[in-house]
From Swiss-Prot:
Belongs to the HAD-like hydrolase superfamily. Cof family. This is HMP-PP phosphatase. The lineage of its organism: Bacteria, Pseudomonadati, Pseudomonadota, Gammaproteobacteria, Enterobacterales. Its EC number is 3.6.1.-. PROSITE patterns: COF_1, COF_2. Keywords: Hydrolase, Magnesium, Metal-binding. It catalyses: 4-amino-2-methyl-5-(diphosphooxymethyl)pyrimidine + H2O = 4-amino-2-methyl-5-(phosphooxymethyl)pyrimidine + phosphate + H(+). The active site is at D8 (nucleophile). It holds the Pfam family Hydrolase_3. SUPFAM superfamilies: HAD-like (SSF56784). PANTHER family: HMP-PP PHOSPHATASE, PTHR47267.
Length: 272
């Protein structure tokens, strides 16, 4: 029996309209009744996730910013990882050949250089939003991550440019087909979950995890039971071909699997 369940949010626990379904909320409550520790592991900001947990009265640990922050049930900061100032400076000031928009994150929030209303659709659940600033004036020592949002082909070309400029000084990953992230070296959800399990006196073998994108790769590959969403990025399936694939987030597939796991643990599971 797993003792901790870690969930990605977008494309996994959240439905396509960016809400948590009633079946999902009910299943999370059942897990807590079984004393299974809940952990939300997401690229979203800690401020937003703390608001969501409060609104839903959920007790859960938080891995946010794709592993840049880990918070306890009480909101205590357990782990932090920031981009080196020289890396942040290079990414912010360099002229990249891309049409993608740039977004900067620190403990105070989400910052970008211009209004992009379409991006706010993903935050209807919480009301979290960006702040408009001159990105050249961002404090370089406080940046947790930088991400670029745009078309996938454009971002793939940008990824090559970033690799050439940064080398091994940053970790690059796609958190969605339309979002490329620049993170501290060694920073990912799997590394953050390792920190959390050590804090809790657990091992990664005691954990199950669910995800759909390349920013979930390390987490899914390191836990005792990793599950890939039916709507996952093809690259993730290719990287972890041995992991089982469940259903689509639009059908609350995580809840569907966990209900079977709780009620019929000894029977084989089918996502249909």
């Amino acid at each position: 029996m797993a003792r901790l369940a870690a969930f990605d949010m977008d494309g996994t626990l959240l439905m396509p309209d960016h809400h948590l379904g009633e079946k999902t909320l009910s299943t999370l409550a059942r897990l807590r009744e079984r004393d299974i520790t809940l952990t939300f592991a997401t690229g979203r900001h800690a401020l937003e996730m703390q608001h969501i947990l409060g609104a839903l009265s959920l007790d859960a640990y938080l891995i946010t910013g794709n592993g840049t922050r880990v918070h306890s049930l009480e909101g205590e900061l357990l782990h932090r990882d920031d981009l080196p100032a020289d890396v942040a400076e290079l990414v912010l000031y360099q002229q990249w050949d891309t049409r993608a928009s740039m977004h900067i994150f620190n403990d105070d929030g989400w910052f970008t250089g211009k209004e992009i209303p379409a991006l706010l659709q993903a935050f209807v659940y919480s009301g979290f939003r960006y702040q408009i600033i001159d990105v050249k004036k961002m404090p370089l020592g406080r940046v947790t991550k930088i991400c670029f949002c745009g078309g996938h082909d454009d971002l793939t070309r940008l990824q090559i440019q970033l690799y050439e400029a940064l080398g091994e000084r940053a970790h690059l990953c796609f958190s969605a087909t339309d979002c490329l992230e620049v993170l501290p070296v060694g920073c990912n959800k799997g590394a953050a979950l390792t920190v959390l399990t050590q804090h809790l006196g657990l091992s990664l073998r005691d954990c199950m995890a669910f995800g759909d994108a390349m920013n979930d790769r390390e987490m899914l590959g390191s836990v005792g039971s990793g599950f890939i969403m039916g709507n996952a990025m093809p690259q993730l399936r290719a990287e972890l071909p041995h992991l089982p694939v469940i259903g689509h987030c639009r059908n609350q597939a995580v809840s569907h699997y966990l209900t079977h796991w709780l009620d019929y643990p000894h029977l084989p599971y089918s996502p249909e």
